[in-house]
């Protein structure tokens, strides 16, 4: 794969202001109607939405790394922290250049991770950064023994499988329609179709009345590529979860490398290998 970050269907849809507005309203309980109220950028794999310079919404939506993971890993949190710190640093630099004496206010961060789970998975789980802290033996009589961890990040993990989190879906029709697209492909695969066949069938039978229909169909070739990438990565992730040796993980890494749709970043996140380790595996693969 190459190093260029590949887009996802979720970001393809929700970087469009007409679809981002109802998403913002669904998460914040607001009723914004003017697209100029929000500013959308994409950083790393995140959809970053700044709402009137007061609130920063960071949304990460993906199929992989969620459905069969027994516990969240570091990647659940680090992209959120990196994106928020980058945004704050940029805003502070802008404001300081205008008035260095004024105390800067920070935008309230709203962090969400969405995933296409199953109907049996919980609608919502709360992921905490402190769950990843390495336990330490602390003297209970010391100051550290009397206080909890001083740095905490909580990220709601929302299952957007069809029929779940209906309150969100009722407010944001594009989110419901996105979820239905993913579920439709999964259903076709369960019937025995290949991933590509399932994607094509979903696109051929998609409801023309859906708000995202025109955007999906106008970029159909790109949508097919994005969905095929996401489903392939999800499949790699499920196989990787069952890999009980380093050798098996390396073999999966090699399979991803020969897939032109897989980037180094995707391989890193899915396997846990560093970039140097991936390049080393790649060199051995090419020297054969």
Model-derived segments and their meaning:
Residues 4, 8, 27, 56-75, ...:
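Short, charged alpha-helical interaction segments and adjacent helix-coil junctions
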